[in-house]
Amino acid sequence: MNQKVLFIDRDGTLINEPPADFQVDRMDKLALEPGVIPVLLALQKAGFRLVMITNQDGLGTTSFPQADFDGPHDLMMAIFTSQGIVFDEVLICPHLPTDGCACRKPQTGIVTPWLKEHALDSAHSYVIGDRETDMALAANMGITGLRYQRASLNWPAIGEQLTRSDRHARVNRVTRETAIDVEVWLDREGDSRINTGIGFFDHMLDQIATHGGLRINIAVKGDLHIDDHHTVEDTALALGEALNKALGDKRGIGRFGFVLPMDECLARCALDISGRPHLEYKAKYSFQRVGDLSTEMVEHFFRSLSYAMACTLHLRTKGKNDHHRVESLFKAFGRTLRQAIRVEGDTLPSSKGVL
Protein backbone atom coordinates (compact mmCIF):
# COMPACT_ATOMS: atom_id res chain seq x y z
CA MET A 1 0.00 0.00 0.00
CA ASN A 2 1.24 3.49 -0.84
CA GLN A 3 2.22 5.48 2.24
CA LYS A 4 1.43 9.05 3.24
CA VAL A 5 4.75 10.60 4.23
CA LEU A 6 5.78 13.97 5.66
CA PHE A 7 9.34 14.99 4.77
CA ILE A 8 10.11 17.55 7.47
CA ASP A 9 12.93 20.07 7.69
CA ARG A 10 14.68 20.37 11.07
CA ASP A 11 16.12 23.84 11.78
CA GLY A 12 13.47 26.55 11.54
CA THR A 13 10.67 23.99 11.30
CA LEU A 14 10.89 21.38 14.05
CA ILE A 15 13.21 23.48 16.18
CA ASN A 16 14.16 27.14 16.29
CA GLU A 17 17.01 28.17 13.99
CA PRO A 18 19.42 30.62 15.69
CA PRO A 19 19.50 33.78 13.54
CA ALA A 20 23.11 34.62 14.42
CA ASP A 21 24.91 31.58 12.99
CA PHE A 22 22.12 29.17 11.88
CA GLN A 23 23.71 26.35 13.89
CA VAL A 24 22.22 24.43 16.80
CA ASP A 25 25.57 23.46 18.29
CA ARG A 26 24.92 23.95 22.02
CA MET A 27 22.26 22.65 24.36
CA ASP A 28 21.10 26.15 25.25
CA LYS A 29 20.27 26.79 21.57
CA LEU A 30 17.78 23.92 21.38
CA ALA A 31 14.13 25.02 21.40
CA LEU A 32 11.17 23.21 19.86
CA GLU A 33 8.83 25.14 17.59
CA PRO A 34 5.48 25.90 19.29
CA GLY A 35 2.88 23.13 19.05
CA VAL A 36 5.10 20.72 17.17
CA ILE A 37 4.66 17.73 19.50
CA PRO A 38 0.82 17.52 19.69
CA VAL A 39 0.51 18.17 15.96
CA LEU A 40 3.04 15.49 15.00
CA LEU A 41 1.20 13.04 17.26
CA ALA A 42 -2.09 13.90 15.54
CA LEU A 43 -0.52 13.53 12.10
CA GLN A 44 0.88 10.12 13.02
CA LYS A 45 -2.59 9.04 14.18
CA ALA A 46 -3.95 10.24 10.84
CA GLY A 47 -1.65 7.73 9.12
CA PHE A 48 1.31 9.90 8.13
CA ARG A 49 4.85 8.52 8.30
CA LEU A 50 7.59 10.97 9.30
CA VAL A 51 10.99 11.50 7.67
CA MET A 52 13.35 14.25 8.77
CA ILE A 53 15.50 15.79 6.04
CA THR A 54 17.99 18.54 6.80
CA ASN A 55 20.99 20.40 5.39
CA GLN A 56 23.74 20.89 8.00
CA ASP A 57 26.42 23.05 6.39
CA GLY A 58 29.93 21.77 6.97
CA LEU A 59 28.93 19.15 9.52
CA GLY A 60 32.00 17.25 10.70
CA THR A 61 34.41 20.07 9.87
CA THR A 62 36.16 22.50 12.19
CA SER A 63 33.40 25.04 11.55
CA PHE A 64 30.77 22.60 12.80
CA PRO A 65 32.26 19.64 14.71
CA GLN A 66 30.20 16.47 14.79
CA ALA A 67 30.23 16.38 18.60
CA ASP A 68 28.73 19.87 18.79
CA PHE A 69 25.87 18.74 16.56
CA ASP A 70 25.26 15.37 18.22
CA GLY A 71 24.45 16.62 21.72
CA PRO A 72 21.49 18.90 20.88
CA HIS A 73 20.32 16.60 18.08
CA ASP A 74 20.28 13.51 20.29
CA LEU A 75 18.38 15.41 22.99
CA MET A 76 15.82 16.56 20.43
CA MET A 77 15.33 13.00 19.20
CA ALA A 78 15.01 11.74 22.78
CA ILE A 79 12.30 14.31 23.48
CA PHE A 80 10.35 13.31 20.38
CA THR A 81 10.70 9.60 21.18
CA SER A 82 9.59 10.10 24.78
CA GLN A 83 6.37 11.66 23.50
CA GLY A 84 5.62 8.87 21.03
CA ILE A 85 6.87 10.61 17.90
CA VAL A 86 8.75 8.28 15.58
CA PHE A 87 10.79 9.28 12.55
CA ASP A 88 11.25 6.46 10.06
CA GLU A 89 14.48 8.06 8.90
CA VAL A 90 16.68 11.07 9.62
CA LEU A 91 18.43 12.20 6.43
CA ILE A 92 21.29 14.67 6.86
CA CYS A 93 23.36 16.37 4.16
CA PRO A 94 26.64 17.57 5.74
CA HIS A 95 27.95 19.40 2.68
CA LEU A 96 28.43 23.06 1.88
CA PRO A 97 26.65 24.69 -1.08
CA THR A 98 30.00 24.95 -2.87
CA ASP A 99 30.60 21.18 -2.65
CA GLY A 100 28.19 20.50 -5.51
CA CYS A 101 26.78 17.33 -3.96
CA ALA A 102 23.60 15.58 -5.10
CA CYS A 103 22.17 15.15 -1.60
CA ARG A 104 21.78 18.77 -0.52
CA LYS A 105 18.23 20.12 -0.66
CA PRO A 106 16.65 20.88 -3.09
CA GLN A 107 18.43 17.99 -4.82
CA THR A 108 16.72 14.65 -4.25
CA GLY A 109 19.81 12.47 -3.92
CA ILE A 110 19.50 12.11 -0.16
CA VAL A 111 15.92 10.85 -0.33
CA THR A 112 16.15 8.70 -3.46
CA PRO A 113 17.35 5.51 -1.68
CA TRP A 114 14.49 5.82 0.82
CA LEU A 115 11.94 6.29 -1.96
CA LYS A 116 13.20 3.18 -3.76
CA GLU A 117 12.34 1.07 -0.71
CA HIS A 118 8.93 2.61 0.06
CA ALA A 119 5.75 3.09 -1.98
CA LEU A 120 4.88 6.79 -1.75
CA ASP A 121 1.34 8.17 -1.91
CA SER A 122 2.39 11.27 -3.83
CA ALA A 123 -1.06 12.87 -3.74
CA HIS A 124 -1.09 12.82 0.07
CA SER A 125 2.59 13.32 0.93
CA TYR A 126 4.23 16.65 1.71
CA VAL A 127 7.49 18.46 2.32
CA ILE A 128 7.26 20.80 5.32
CA GLY A 129 9.97 23.41 5.71
CA ASP A 130 10.64 27.09 6.24
CA ARG A 131 12.86 27.79 3.23
CA GLU A 132 12.46 28.07 -0.51
CA THR A 133 14.82 25.11 -0.88
CA ASP A 134 12.24 22.96 0.90
CA MET A 135 9.57 24.04 -1.57
CA ALA A 136 11.94 23.33 -4.45
CA LEU A 137 12.60 19.88 -3.00
CA ALA A 138 8.86 19.23 -2.95
CA ALA A 139 8.60 20.26 -6.60
CA ASN A 140 11.52 18.01 -7.53
CA MET A 141 9.85 15.09 -5.72
CA GLY A 142 6.51 15.75 -7.38
CA ILE A 143 4.66 16.36 -4.12
CA THR A 144 3.17 19.38 -2.35
CA GLY A 145 5.28 21.74 -0.24
CA LEU A 146 4.03 23.52 2.88
CA ARG A 147 6.06 26.62 3.77
CA TYR A 148 6.28 26.71 7.57
CA GLN A 149 5.92 30.13 9.19
CA ARG A 150 5.46 30.55 12.91
CA ALA A 151 3.11 33.53 12.50
CA SER A 152 0.83 32.02 9.86
CA LEU A 153 1.32 28.47 8.59
CA ASN A 154 2.47 27.20 11.97
CA TRP A 155 2.15 23.68 13.37
CA PRO A 156 -1.48 23.98 14.52
CA ALA A 157 -2.42 25.37 11.09
CA ILE A 158 -0.54 22.59 9.31
CA GLY A 159 -2.22 19.99 11.50
CA GLU A 160 -5.65 21.42 10.73
CA GLN A 161 -4.93 21.49 7.00
CA LEU A 162 -3.63 17.93 6.79
CA THR A 163 -6.22 16.27 9.02
CA ARG A 164 -9.28 18.10 7.70
CA SER A 165 -11.45 15.67 5.78
CA ASP A 166 -11.97 16.41 2.10
CA ARG A 167 -11.96 12.93 0.63
CA HIS A 168 -12.17 13.07 -3.14
CA ALA A 169 -11.66 10.86 -6.17
CA ARG A 170 -12.23 10.97 -9.89
CA VAL A 171 -12.58 8.04 -12.27
CA ASN A 172 -12.72 8.13 -16.05
CA ARG A 173 -13.94 4.92 -17.67
CA VAL A 174 -13.99 4.51 -21.45
CA THR A 175 -15.11 1.38 -23.29
CA ARG A 176 -16.47 0.67 -26.75
CA GLU A 177 -19.98 1.18 -25.39
CA THR A 178 -19.62 4.05 -22.92
CA ALA A 179 -17.52 7.03 -21.86
CA ILE A 180 -18.03 7.87 -18.19
CA ASP A 181 -16.55 10.53 -15.94
CA VAL A 182 -17.33 10.26 -12.22
CA GLU A 183 -16.13 12.59 -9.47
CA VAL A 184 -17.07 12.23 -5.79
CA TRP A 185 -16.49 14.31 -2.67
CA LEU A 186 -17.34 12.40 0.51
CA ASP A 187 -17.20 15.44 2.79
CA ARG A 188 -19.10 17.97 0.67
CA GLU A 189 -22.83 18.20 0.09
CA GLY A 190 -25.02 19.65 -2.63
CA ASP A 191 -24.33 20.89 -6.15
CA SER A 192 -24.21 17.39 -7.64
CA ARG A 193 -24.37 17.28 -11.44
CA ILE A 194 -25.58 14.00 -12.91
CA ASN A 195 -26.34 13.26 -16.56
CA THR A 196 -26.44 9.65 -17.72
CA GLY A 197 -28.98 10.15 -20.49
CA ILE A 198 -31.54 8.16 -18.45
CA GLY A 199 -33.74 10.60 -16.57
CA PHE A 200 -35.05 8.24 -13.90
CA PHE A 201 -31.56 6.82 -13.33
CA ASP A 202 -30.24 10.37 -12.83
CA HIS A 203 -32.95 10.89 -10.22
CA MET A 204 -31.93 7.69 -8.41
CA LEU A 205 -28.24 8.59 -8.41
CA ASP A 206 -29.14 11.98 -7.00
CA GLN A 207 -30.89 10.15 -4.13
CA ILE A 208 -27.56 8.51 -3.26
CA ALA A 209 -25.84 11.89 -3.22
CA THR A 210 -28.60 13.65 -1.27
CA HIS A 211 -29.16 10.98 1.37
CA GLY A 212 -25.50 9.99 1.50
CA GLY A 213 -24.47 13.55 2.31
CA LEU A 214 -21.92 13.68 -0.49
CA ARG A 215 -21.38 15.40 -3.81
CA ILE A 216 -21.38 13.38 -7.03
CA ASN A 217 -20.69 14.53 -10.57
CA ILE A 218 -21.43 12.00 -13.30
CA ALA A 219 -21.30 12.55 -17.06
CA VAL A 220 -22.11 9.61 -19.33
CA LYS A 221 -22.18 9.01 -23.06
CA GLY A 222 -23.57 5.54 -23.67
CA ASP A 223 -25.09 3.34 -26.35
CA LEU A 224 -28.67 4.10 -25.33
CA HIS A 225 -29.76 3.53 -28.92
CA ILE A 226 -29.32 -0.17 -28.09
CA ASP A 227 -30.57 -0.28 -24.47
CA ASP A 228 -29.68 0.96 -20.98
CA HIS A 229 -27.57 -2.04 -19.92
CA HIS A 230 -24.05 -0.76 -20.59
CA THR A 231 -24.81 2.75 -19.35
CA VAL A 232 -26.16 1.54 -16.00
CA GLU A 233 -23.52 -1.15 -15.52
CA ASP A 234 -20.52 1.02 -16.39
CA THR A 235 -21.83 3.93 -14.32
CA ALA A 236 -22.06 1.59 -11.33
CA LEU A 237 -18.52 0.33 -11.88
CA ALA A 238 -17.10 3.84 -12.19
CA LEU A 239 -19.04 5.14 -9.19
CA GLY A 240 -18.02 2.18 -7.04
CA GLU A 241 -14.38 2.64 -7.98
CA ALA A 242 -14.55 6.36 -7.21
CA LEU A 243 -16.14 5.75 -3.80
CA ASN A 244 -13.50 3.15 -2.99
CA LYS A 245 -10.68 5.49 -4.00
CA ALA A 246 -12.12 8.43 -2.07
CA LEU A 247 -12.26 6.34 1.11
CA GLY A 248 -8.48 5.98 0.98
CA ASP A 249 -7.08 3.78 3.75
CA LYS A 250 -10.52 3.85 5.48
CA ARG A 251 -8.96 4.93 8.76
CA GLY A 252 -11.56 6.13 11.25
CA ILE A 253 -14.67 5.36 9.17
CA GLY A 254 -17.83 3.89 10.69
CA ARG A 255 -17.56 1.02 8.16
CA PHE A 256 -21.00 -0.43 8.92
CA GLY A 257 -24.19 1.04 8.34
CA PHE A 258 -30.48 1.03 7.88
CA VAL A 259 -34.03 0.59 7.46
CA LEU A 260 -35.95 3.17 5.46
CA PRO A 261 -39.72 3.56 5.17
CA MET A 262 -41.04 5.36 2.09
CA ASP A 263 -44.80 5.68 1.80
CA GLU A 264 -46.05 2.08 1.53
CA CYS A 265 -42.51 0.69 1.02
CA LEU A 266 -40.06 -0.61 3.58
CA ALA A 267 -36.46 -0.85 2.37
CA ARG A 268 -33.66 -2.54 4.25
CA CYS A 269 -30.01 -1.89 3.54
CA ALA A 270 -26.98 -3.25 5.36
CA LEU A 271 -23.51 -2.22 4.24
CA ASP A 272 -20.02 -3.31 5.25
CA ILE A 273 -17.09 -1.55 3.57
CA SER A 274 -15.13 -4.72 4.03
CA GLY A 275 -12.94 -5.05 0.96
CA ARG A 276 -14.98 -8.16 0.06
CA PRO A 277 -17.54 -7.59 -2.73
CA HIS A 278 -20.87 -9.35 -2.25
CA LEU A 279 -24.53 -8.54 -2.89
CA GLU A 280 -27.71 -10.03 -1.46
CA TYR A 281 -30.73 -8.50 -3.20
CA LYS A 282 -34.46 -9.11 -2.91
CA ALA A 283 -37.05 -7.02 -4.73
CA LYS A 284 -40.00 -7.74 -7.01
CA TYR A 285 -41.41 -5.39 -9.62
CA SER A 286 -44.71 -5.35 -11.49
CA PHE A 287 -43.37 -3.78 -14.67
CA GLN A 288 -40.24 -4.02 -16.82
CA ARG A 289 -39.49 -0.31 -16.64
CA VAL A 290 -39.78 2.61 -14.27
CA GLY A 291 -39.66 5.72 -16.38
CA ASP A 292 -36.83 5.09 -18.84
CA LEU A 293 -34.93 2.66 -16.56
CA SER A 294 -35.23 -1.13 -16.84
CA THR A 295 -36.18 -2.56 -13.43
CA GLU A 296 -33.90 -5.56 -14.02
CA MET A 297 -30.96 -3.14 -14.15
CA VAL A 298 -31.51 -2.01 -10.55
CA GLU A 299 -30.07 -5.24 -9.16
CA HIS A 300 -27.34 -5.18 -11.78
CA PHE A 301 -26.43 -1.62 -10.76
CA PHE A 302 -25.97 -2.53 -7.12
CA ARG A 303 -24.11 -5.74 -7.97
CA SER A 304 -21.65 -3.84 -10.18
CA LEU A 305 -21.34 -1.09 -7.57
CA SER A 306 -20.59 -3.51 -4.73
CA TYR A 307 -17.98 -5.23 -6.90
CA ALA A 308 -16.16 -2.00 -7.80
CA MET A 309 -16.49 -0.54 -4.31
CA ALA A 310 -15.35 -3.81 -2.70
CA CYS A 311 -18.19 -3.82 -0.18
CA THR A 312 -20.71 -6.29 1.20
CA LEU A 313 -24.24 -5.04 0.49
CA HIS A 314 -27.62 -6.47 1.52
CA LEU A 315 -30.71 -4.85 -0.01
CA ARG A 316 -34.40 -5.67 0.06
CA THR A 317 -37.63 -3.76 -0.37
CA LYS A 318 -41.36 -4.44 -0.16
CA GLY A 319 -44.15 -2.23 -1.45
CA LYS A 320 -46.90 -1.75 -4.01
CA ASN A 321 -45.46 0.90 -6.33
CA ASP A 322 -42.44 0.16 -8.55
CA HIS A 323 -41.27 3.77 -8.52
CA HIS A 324 -41.30 3.78 -4.72
CA ARG A 325 -39.64 0.35 -4.51
CA VAL A 326 -36.71 1.43 -6.64
CA GLU A 327 -36.39 4.84 -5.04
CA SER A 328 -36.49 3.35 -1.54
CA LEU A 329 -33.46 1.18 -2.36
CA PHE A 330 -31.39 4.10 -3.61
CA LYS A 331 -32.39 6.25 -0.64
CA ALA A 332 -31.66 3.47 1.83
CA PHE A 333 -28.27 2.88 0.26
CA GLY A 334 -27.51 6.60 0.46
CA ARG A 335 -28.44 6.80 4.16
CA THR A 336 -26.44 3.68 4.93
CA LEU A 337 -23.47 4.99 2.98
CA ARG A 338 -23.64 8.23 5.00
CA GLN A 339 -23.23 6.20 8.21
CA ALA A 340 -20.48 3.96 6.92
CA ILE A 341 -18.20 6.65 5.45
CA ARG A 342 -18.51 9.02 8.41
CA VAL A 343 -15.17 9.55 10.15
CA GLU A 344 -15.60 8.64 13.81
CA GLY A 345 -12.01 8.30 14.99
CA ASP A 346 -8.49 7.69 13.75
CA THR A 347 -8.13 3.90 13.87
CA LEU A 348 -8.79 1.31 11.19
CA PRO A 349 -12.11 -0.44 11.97
CA SER A 350 -10.73 -3.94 11.51
CA SER A 351 -9.02 -6.44 13.81
CA LYS A 352 -6.99 -7.56 10.79
CA GLY A 353 -5.42 -4.13 10.38
CA VAL A 354 -6.54 -3.82 6.78
CA LEU A 355 -9.77 -3.31 4.83
Swiss-Prot record:
<dbReference type="InterPro" id="IPR005954">
    <property type="entry name" value="HisB_N"/>
</dbReference>
<feature type="region of interest" description="Imidazoleglycerol-phosphate dehydratase">
    <location>
        <begin position="167"/>
        <end position="355"/>
    </location>
</feature>
<comment type="similarity">
    <text>In the N-terminal section; belongs to the histidinol-phosphatase family.</text>
</comment>
<feature type="binding site">
    <location>
        <position position="9"/>
    </location>
    <ligand>
        <name>Mg(2+)</name>
    </ligand>
</feature>
<protein>
    <recommendedName>
        <fullName>Histidine biosynthesis bifunctional protein HisB</fullName>
        <ecNumber>3.1.3.15</ecNumber>
        <ecNumber>4.2.1.19</ecNumber>
    </recommendedName>
</protein>
<dbReference type="InterPro" id="IPR036412">
    <property type="entry name" value="HAD-like_sf"/>
</dbReference>
<feature type="binding site">
    <location>
        <position position="101"/>
    </location>
    <ligand>
        <name>Zn(2+)</name>
    </ligand>
</feature>
<dbReference type="InterPro" id="IPR006549">
    <property type="entry name" value="HAD-SF_hydro_IIIA"/>
</dbReference>
<dbReference type="GO" id="GO:0005737">
    <property type="term" value="C:cytoplasm"/>
</dbReference>
<keyword id="KW-0460">Magnesium</keyword>
<keyword id="KW-0963">Cytoplasm</keyword>
<dbReference type="GO" id="GO:0004401">
    <property type="term" value="F:histidinol-phosphatase activity"/>
</dbReference>
<feature type="active site" description="Nucleophile">
    <location>
        <position position="9"/>
    </location>
</feature>
<keyword id="KW-0511">Multifunctional enzyme</keyword>
<keyword id="KW-0862">Zinc</keyword>
<feature type="binding site">
    <location>
        <position position="130"/>
    </location>
    <ligand>
        <name>Mg(2+)</name>
    </ligand>
</feature>
<feature type="active site" description="Proton donor">
    <location>
        <position position="11"/>
    </location>
</feature>
<comment type="pathway">
    <text>Amino-acid biosynthesis; L-histidine biosynthesis; L-histidine from 5-phospho-alpha-D-ribose 1-diphosphate: step 8/9.</text>
</comment>
<keyword id="KW-0028">Amino-acid biosynthesis</keyword>
<comment type="pathway">
    <text>Amino-acid biosynthesis; L-histidine biosynthesis; L-histidine from 5-phospho-alpha-D-ribose 1-diphosphate: step 6/9.</text>
</comment>
<feature type="binding site">
    <location>
        <position position="103"/>
    </location>
    <ligand>
        <name>Zn(2+)</name>
    </ligand>
</feature>
<dbReference type="InterPro" id="IPR006543">
    <property type="entry name" value="Histidinol-phos"/>
</dbReference>
<comment type="similarity">
    <text>In the C-terminal section; belongs to the imidazoleglycerol-phosphate dehydratase family.</text>
</comment>
<keyword id="KW-0456">Lyase</keyword>
<dbReference type="InterPro" id="IPR020566">
    <property type="entry name" value="His_synth_bifunc_HisB"/>
</dbReference>
<keyword id="KW-0368">Histidine biosynthesis</keyword>
<dbReference type="InterPro" id="IPR023214">
    <property type="entry name" value="HAD_sf"/>
</dbReference>
<dbReference type="Pfam" id="PF00475">
    <property type="entry name" value="IGPD"/>
</dbReference>
<dbReference type="InterPro" id="IPR000807">
    <property type="entry name" value="ImidazoleglycerolP_deHydtase"/>
</dbReference>
<dbReference type="InterPro" id="IPR020568">
    <property type="entry name" value="Ribosomal_Su5_D2-typ_SF"/>
</dbReference>
<feature type="region of interest" description="Histidinol-phosphatase">
    <location>
        <begin position="1"/>
        <end position="166"/>
    </location>
</feature>
<dbReference type="GO" id="GO:0004424">
    <property type="term" value="F:imidazoleglycerol-phosphate dehydratase activity"/>
</dbReference>
<feature type="binding site">
    <location>
        <position position="95"/>
    </location>
    <ligand>
        <name>Zn(2+)</name>
    </ligand>
</feature>
<dbReference type="GO" id="GO:0000105">
    <property type="term" value="P:L-histidine biosynthetic process"/>
</dbReference>
<dbReference type="InterPro" id="IPR038494">
    <property type="entry name" value="IGPD_sf"/>
</dbReference>
<dbReference type="GO" id="GO:0046872">
    <property type="term" value="F:metal ion binding"/>
</dbReference>
<dbReference type="InterPro" id="IPR020565">
    <property type="entry name" value="ImidazoleglycerP_deHydtase_CS"/>
</dbReference>
<feature type="binding site">
    <location>
        <position position="93"/>
    </location>
    <ligand>
        <name>Zn(2+)</name>
    </ligand>
</feature>
<keyword id="KW-0378">Hydrolase</keyword>
<keyword id="KW-0479">Metal-binding</keyword>
<dbReference type="Pfam" id="PF13242">
    <property type="entry name" value="Hydrolase_like"/>
</dbReference>
<feature type="binding site">
    <location>
        <position position="11"/>
    </location>
    <ligand>
        <name>Mg(2+)</name>
    </ligand>
</feature>
